[in-house]
Amino acid sequence: MKKILIVQPIHEKGMELLKSNSDYSYEVVEDLRVENVKQKNVDADAVSLRTSILPADAIENAKNLKIISRHGVGYDNIDLNSCKKRNIDVAITATANAVAVAEHVLFMLLSISKRKSMYDHSVKSGKFTERNKLPKTIEIWDKNILIAGFGRIGKALIKRCLGFEMNVFVYDPFVDSKTISKMGGKKVEDLSAAIKDMDAVSLHIPLTDQTKNIINYKLLKTMKKNCIIINAARGGIINEKDLDRALNENLIFGAGIDVFEVCLLYTSPSPRDS
């Protein structure tokens, strides 16, 4: 019987579909450390992968592996060279989570602009009189937002930003100005030049040699003091040390980070083991 390895649980409807098919068996892996995944996929014919890492040795270890299906858009967490050598197919779910990510970006933007964590902590701590001492909040109405990357997520995000009456600018060398204009945005040609006039920046670009650390201290210094930067794309696009420095120096208003260059979840022992 063919075996599917589900690395990281998926939506219950997906699990129901798997259960309804008796042509194969499946196993769900919740311990996402690379060594554990490597052990589990030895006899797998197919792997369903979310955000965890599948390096070369984990792929070479799976002698029966024929396909890896990425539960998302990017595939930089998969060693493609190993897949090519073994003729292993790699699939993505291109349209599955565009709206969810766009909503998540907006959630982070609103949470940061309204200092949600600070005010929430103040109320839960019973410090009701402290609110006037907390740092100021800002509106996103009539503010400039730059969407860097205008794929499915960028297109889902622009609709929601326009709903809040934001002024949307788009940076994407592969999308023409007419397409962007039709959706209510304005195309910019130079990311570095445009970013200094923005009140918010949302990153939706792939991680490549060209985009690695594209957001660095030099660029962060040019941004407005009230600028909020959101990264729901890939860790490594923002230089994390530079961002930490910029935040500590109050160069920007805040940052919403959904991804990191190195995720300890896949390399550290699980909480129950420590």
Regions found by a protein language model. Name each.
Residues 266-273:
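Conserved small/polar residues in nucleotide/adenosyl-binding loops
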